[in-house]
């Protein structure tokens, strides 16, 4: 068996990336954003092709991400922020609801969304993970944007003339 294998493509040239950052836990979000922007640059994404917006907190990420996805101006989106456990049930609500919104937007629109919302127990944990998560989200966004483009169906009138992955020889089955 010799399967067709799509390898990860981390070339960000020509990609348009939208970033939504929650301002709650500002220091963490800023560290994530800086690392994310640096990594996008290393991957070849032009800074003019990146839009950054901020929202009050993690629960508001979904609204901004949805609007950006609906614009179809972006190849991928990135959500950044931090939810740090407190003494109430609020942590679970915010963590679960923000993650669900982010996933739903990606699935409903087909626009990849890298979820960089840290859910941690302490400020120290958030600080230790912020830069790494920001850079990771840049890589995820670029890879998934390229994968989505590679998996996009081609529009052609004569499918029998091309050599697409899904074309098989007619062996009478």
Swiss-Prot record:
Entries under CDD domains matching the protein: Lumazine_synthase-I
Enzyme Commission numbers on file: 2.5.1.78
Pfam families membership: DMRL_synthase
GO annotation terms (biological process): riboflavin biosynthetic process
Keywords on record: Riboflavin biosynthesis, Transferase
One Gene Ontology MF term: 6,7-dimethyl-8-ribityllumazine synthase activity
Keyword Transcription regulation appears in the UniProt entry: no
Binding site for 5-amino-6-(D-ribitylamino)uracil: 24, 58-60, 82-84, 115
Catalytic residues in the record: 90
One GO term describing the cellular component: cytosol
NCBIfam families listed in its UniProt record: lumazine-synth
HAMAP family: Lumazine_synth
Family: Belongs to the DMRL synthase family.
Protein name (Swiss-Prot/TrEMBL): 6,7-dimethyl-8-ribityllumazine synthase
Gene assigned in the entry: ribH
